Amino acid sequence: MEPGNDTQISEFLLLGFSQEPGLQPFLFGLFLSMYLVTVLGNLLIILATISDSHLHTPMYFFLSNLSFADICVTSTTIPKMLMNIQTQNKVITYIACLMQMYFFILFAGFENFLLSVMAYDRFVAICHPLHYMVIMNPHLCGLLVLASWTMSALYSLLQILMVVRLSFCTALEIPHFFCELNQVIQLACSDSFLNHMVIYFTVALLGGGPLTGILYSYSKIISSIHAISSAQGKYKAFSTCASHLSVVSLFYGAILGVYLSSAATRNSHSSATASVMYTVVTPMLNPFIYSLRNKDIKRALGIHLLWGTMKGQFFKKCP
């Protein structure tokens, strides 16, 4: 088929991780378990933040938004992969592929911006503690989250519009478990040079900008902690941002690892395997990082579990 702007396609094939039939039940069980843990863990963080008045602070407001984004990122990719394994059908329609790309970029981009906002929140809390509640007022917090959603939505829309202009021929097999942007662009039989340039430019701008903000915030935080005289004061100050620093390291480290591994091996299946780190593993670990390191979250979750147990015992005794 000759490439051209009028080339019409209706579907792609998601090849997933392995073609071995014997591995499919194992992959289904593994990813279903990881997906359920991710959704449950992040839902508990959201419910604890909403229901406990002690957690109605800017830091936990941002954390609940991060948990929501984690649920959305995994829900964009994993259910479709599980359905494909269960039905032994690798087909995804062209429209569904575009929608999956749009929402994945939207939620992943939002996390990128939100982590920068959370770094700024920790910067204000440690470097300007007396003015923290004045600076991080509800209006500013809402505005920062709204701006993160808006920028991510516009970036995602730009990438989808760039894909729509491409023509596709007969090679419609995506060697991945979801419609990953680079993999889809590589299938195009029309010129995709502009697409790659837009990706490189926007990633450098919208990825490098927030990362620079995070590094700047933590440089100021480290300077402020270093100026504290007591060891207990230093530990208390550092503990307030340790969880966020762990999540940032995991998020950017996973993304960097994916692109370094794909550039080194040039193997699409290796890239798909590495992508599990930031699409599944990172969202799954985030609730554990925050709950294990945070006494307020553990207390709130403990109260809810205790209250749920007491209610269960009460209703069990009722005739």
Swiss-Prot record:
Residues 47-54, 121-139, 218-237, 293-319 are cytoplasmic. It is a multi-pass membrane protein. It holds the Pfam family 7tm_4. Keywords: Cell membrane, Disulfide bond, G-protein coupled receptor, Glycoprotein, Membrane, Olfaction, Receptor, Sensory transduction, Transducer, Transmembrane, Transmembrane helix. Glycans are attached at residue 5. Gene3D superfamilies: Rhodopsin 7-helix transmembrane proteins. GO terms for cellular component: membrane; plasma membrane. This is Olfactory receptor 7A5. It comes from Homo sapiens.
